[in-house]
Amino acid sequence: MRIILLGPPGAGKGTQSERIVERYRVPQLSTGDMLRAAVAAETPVGLEAKAIMESGGLVSDAIVVGIVADRIEEADAKNGFILDGFPRTVEQAKALDAMLAQKGIALDAVVEFVVDETALVGRIAKRAEETAARGQPVRKDDTPEVFKTRLDAYRKQTAPLSDYYAGTGLLRKIDGMKPIDVVTGDVTALLDGFRETASS
């Protein structure tokens, strides 16, 4: 099972990722973690990334795709993986598609968590209020203002991926505003359907 998770910040991707990992025993691949691991392991791509990061540059799409390519060759990813946080742009998606095609690997689905942005901002504001009421510090990115900025960035940069993957026939939308356990049930039903198709 090879899937990509899409959805704006606050849509519950992290929670659902954890549950997918637990149920299907496939690793969640975070580009940040993979980048750090490649740098620490001093792989050829990792050394290239390290030099760029040390000079204050941004790691190119080609390097990130190279790191993903190395990571999915590892034993724990042989039966599948979840990509969360990558790709972020249509260009990255195209580069990822080309790399997977070279390896003869096909994605099973791109799962997009669809949310009501107004309700999402309300949810974040409520969480910030409850945190402050408990006398705990509110995380900077948990304030409605910062959250709206993150939502705007997502809409501009990552939302076009929805159209791109819809065009490939891989996109599956799930209502991310339902209670967490209901969303998990919807995700499970979807992914179990793919497993049955693959094994029949």
From Swiss-Prot:
GO terms for molecular function: adenylate kinase activity; ATP binding. AMP binds at T31, R36, G57, L58, V59, G85, F86, P87, R88, Q92, R139, R150. It catalyses: AMP + ATP = 2 ADP. InterPro entries: Adenyl_kin_sub, Adenylat/UMP-CMP_kin, Adenylat_kinase_CS, P-loop_NTPase. It is found in: Cytoplasm. One of its GO terms (cellular component) is cytoplasm. Keywords: ATP-binding, Cytoplasm, Kinase, Nucleotide biosynthesis, Nucleotide-binding, Transferase. It is an enzyme of class 2 (transferase). Residues 30-59 are annotated as: NMP. Pathway: Purine metabolism; AMP biosynthesis via salvage pathway; AMP from ADP: step 1/1. CDD domains: ADK (cd01428). Residues 126-142 are annotated as: LID. ATP binds at G10, A11, G12, K13, G14, T15, R127, K178. The keyword ATP-binding applies. GO terms for biological process: AMP salvage. Its EC number is 2.7.4.3. Monomer. PANTHER family: NUCLEOTIDE KINASE (PTHR23359). Catalyzes the reversible transfer of the terminal phosphate group between ATP and AMP. Plays an important role in cellular energy homeostasis and in adenine nucleotide metabolism. Consists of three domains, a large central CORE domain and two small peripheral domains, NMPbind and LID, which undergo movements during catalysis. The LID domain closes over the site of phosphoryl transfer upon ATP binding. Assembling and dissambling the active center during each catalytic cycle provides an effective means to prevent ATP hydrolysis. Belongs to the adenylate kinase family. NCBIfam families: adk (TIGR01351), PRK00279.1-3 (NF001381), PRK14527.1 (NF011100), PRK14528.1 (NF011101), PRK14531.1 (NF011104), PRK14532.1 (NF011105). This is Adenylate kinase. It comes from Methylorubrum extorquens (strain PA1).
